[in-house]
Amino acid sequence: MDQNLFLTKFQFTPQRLMWVGLFMVYLLGLFSPLIENDSAQFAVMAMRMAQENDYLHLIKGFEPYLDKPHMHFWLSALSFELFGFHHWAYRLPSLLMLIVATVSIYRWSNLFYNTQISQWVAFLFASAQTIILSGIDVRTDAVLVGFVSLALYQFSSFIETEKKSALILGSVAAAFAFSTKGQIALLVIGIAILVHLSLRKKWKLLVSHHFLLALFVFSLCISPMLYAYYIQFDQHPELIIRGQGERTGLKFIFWEQSMERLSGEGLGKNSSNYFFFVHSFLWEFLPWTVLFIGGLILTIKRNQQKLSVMEVFPYLVLLIVFPLISMAQFKLPHYLNVLMPLFALATAKFIAYCFHLKKTPKSVKLIQLLILLLYFTLGMFLFFGIFEERVNSFLFVLLLAVSIWSLRAVIHLKFHSFERLLMFNAIGLIFINLILNTSFYPKLAEFQAGYTTAKELKASPYAKSPIYKLTAKHSWALDFYHQRSLKLLKAADLDLFEGLLYVSQEEFDAIKASGKTYDLISKKTQFSVSRLNLKFLNPKTREQVTSYRYLLQLTPSETR
């Protein structure tokens, strides 16, 4: 089938319906309870900013926080100021930045490819599993990828057209990306700029007045973040951060942040495996992983032929950046999110190639259909096989019926077979992620004792009462949903304490053994749901890995 015919047809309802379905995934994800640790932790940090009207200091629990810069927390705190302390308000800035990212990636791709290919680039990015996850398990990555994508588009636009407005907007976006997560943003943006300049042979732009303009705008836009760091850390060398004193915020953001991750000092080493991001990518870019690999193989095979200079652009950037971040001794899967725009751009070329073929390559067709089957099998398992009490049963039946109807409708479309295959996978990923966001994640939240305790307190006389704890161990979910951070009670003051005390199973056993009287306000099941394992997923063995958290009302010993 002629590619132009496909591209014309792709303007019709099927594409629009895929975007609507994908948007529903993100929209419904706004209303799922926050997950500990990072997502709930960052929400509490932003909540403190808004409650205390203190936007200069980053505080994690009872200690100053020197890790991620301020931008994500500022945006979330502003959302709280506007809409109140709700989990959807915390996620809203990240969702908006993912929309910015998607639009920017579309326009960025449109500088080099036609409109239809660019639409696929944007959809591949927005539907990658790790990007969808970043919209519900909100850390700093959604805001980061939004600003990075905007910077990539604007700087590429400047290199292609030399419009000053694009240079200024790119510099602002790069500054905000740097203010969100530090040097990783500049690494990706900087390498992309250098590769683009090299391919277009426009090195003269680096030694022109444009460079000074970009540097000025960038410096101006990072100054609020630098000022906040200076006030909190440079003026207080007595602060002890990760066992070290005399820490300077300015030195940290310009040097130590990346060095700590590369060396594993401070944050610790969690992976020396240089292939960590390779196997992480295999699931993070689902369901399009095979398409990227196909594009990579295609590019290598065509190495001896004449290639468009921008065809190799995303691969060259990835070839430089990917090994650099793989050398870090501290790695987490979501660190790859910032590269997803490049993965999507690289994959779209393979999609265009497949539409030139009369038939879809058998290996690609087989693997993509297996992924589709996996999505529906996993969706059924998540709904029926994990939790005995099922939520949103009607929604599940409706979703399954609509998905089956959509698959049947796609089968009868007179489109290229590869086009139908892509639509199959789009339906599958929307199906599984709607189940995750409307059923699985909300049910997981019921195993966060802090969340369920706070829900119960809202309808009790203790709704606005302060709560104490005996250790600095995190209680982010309770902090956020009670809208008050728990206070620390010294063990020596326990006998004279009067009020609410939130304790672990071990602490409860000790209080009970001491003979101290108490009123049990609540007893809730606790599990670290961000670290799922087979014993938890199996209802028969779940109790082996769960514990309890207790909320007690204590009175002073002398008054009894």
Residue ranges and their predicted role:
Residues L133, A166-K181, F322-S326:
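Membrane-interface alpha helices of multi-pass inner-membrane proteins
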Residues Q11-V20, I105-S127:
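Transmembrane-helix signature of polytopic, membrane-embedded enzymes
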Residues I168, L262, L298-R560:
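Membrane-embedded architecture of ER/inner-membrane glycosylation machinery
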Residues L92-F112, L150:
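Transmembrane-helix motifs of polytopic, lipid-linked glycan transferases
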Residues K9, L111, T115, A151-L169, ...:
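Membrane-interface transmembrane helices that cradle and orient dolichyl/undecaprenyl
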Residues T130-V143:
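Short acidic/glycine- and proline-prone juxtamembrane loop motifs at membrane-interface regions
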Residues F23-V25, Q41-P64, M71-W74, L78, ...:
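Extracytosolic helix-loop segments that constitute the early lumenal/periplasmic catalytic or substrate-binding loops
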Residues A185-H334, L339-L342, A348-F350, S363-L370, ...:
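Transmembrane-lumen/periplasm boundary regions of multi-pass, lipid-linked membrane glycan transferases
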